[in-house]
């Protein structure tokens, strides 16, 4: 029996609801960037290669950091990792609006935002698994709907 088994009855669903909202914001952040990218491209005078580079660096940086996020998620408080990553990528997203050139956009969007989001996933899914033993598949399926709504 873990400490997660001793929480009050509905708490695991409250945790799921909060993680659902966080995941919704995570996916909305990714999708809205694609929507505004033509405006950013025009405003900053970016080429097709530059726009593709931003997406490539985001994906590469994210892919490199996800295992590190999992490693850290196994050793430190997952709830604080989720909290810190949401705050970090939210602030990075806010500062993305202040970018005035390609390099700054790569740093803010790809490295800062992608880096923050990379630490979210492993801790997020681990928390769901911790709180939902017999309802794990159902909880994961509910959580996954945030991907499609976001």
Q: Residue locations for each model-derived region?
A:
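Extracytoplasmic
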Residues: 14-48, 69
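Helical-face signature of the major facilitator-like transporter fold
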Residues: 19-27, 59, 93, 101-114
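Conserved glycine-rich helix-kink/hinge and helix-boundary motifs of the Major Facilitator Superfamily
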Residues: 20, 52, 83, 137, ...
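Residue-level signature of mid-helix packing/kink "hotspots" within the transmembrane helices
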Residues: 31, 59-67
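Juxtamembrane helix-start elements in MFS-like secondary transporters
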Residues: 47-51, 55
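Structural signature of transmembrane alpha-helices in multi-pass secondary transporters
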Residues: 55-58, 62, 114, 143-150
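Conserved MFS/SLC helix-loop-helix module at the cytosolic interface between two early adjacent transmembrane helices
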Residues: 64-103
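Cytoplasmic helix-loop-helix junction between adjacent transmembrane helices
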Residues: 108-147
